[in-house]
């Protein structure tokens, strides 16, 4: 019997089309959700940030400070002084330029107030009225021509006056208390601003020097 030659053929590879490979089944993965704990942390963080911003804004807009009042300049006129050791005297007219600065976010409305001039520690030698008015937010109002008539006739004790007259200087102090209210975002607050300015009246030169306001 003649042996038959057997040839084993490798299996033929079948290649599919490229479009068939790409159109294979797609695997859909379910989107993972954030744990409930993280959402709670995010919410609390946002609340804390909003609360902090509210505190910062309230501290800026709702903070109410005292308006600043000061004497910018003072001039003199009709100055007279003299007498003797038993009857010394002085008389003068002071004309002041006063400013009131309101640094708040609300208007400042103040009532009529009194400006007093004090001679050293001996007492009041003159006073006048400052009419009330309105100072808008972040504005400065200048009150010009505030006239005060001063004189030693108001003093009960003229001790040391003769010595000061001979030296040619009088130590004076102007004091004013301004009371008013400030309205910010519906809130009304009463504030009292106090002015205290020291100065020296030069009798020889007939002018004010060393003006300093606290």
From Swiss-Prot:
Domain of life (superkingdom): Eukaryota
GO BP term, pick one: defense response to other organism
Keyword Cytoplasm: no
Alphabetical list of InterPro entries matching this protein: NDR1-like
Coiled coil: none
Segments crossing the lipid bilayer: 41-61
GO cellular component: membrane
Coarse class of the protein's main subcellular location: membrane
Protein localization: Membrane
Keywords: Membrane, Transmembrane, Transmembrane helix
Topology with respect to the bilayer: Single-pass membrane protein
Family assignment from sequence similarity: Belongs to the LEA type 2 family.
Protein name, entry field: Late embryogenesis abundant protein At1g64065
Organism: Arabidopsis thaliana
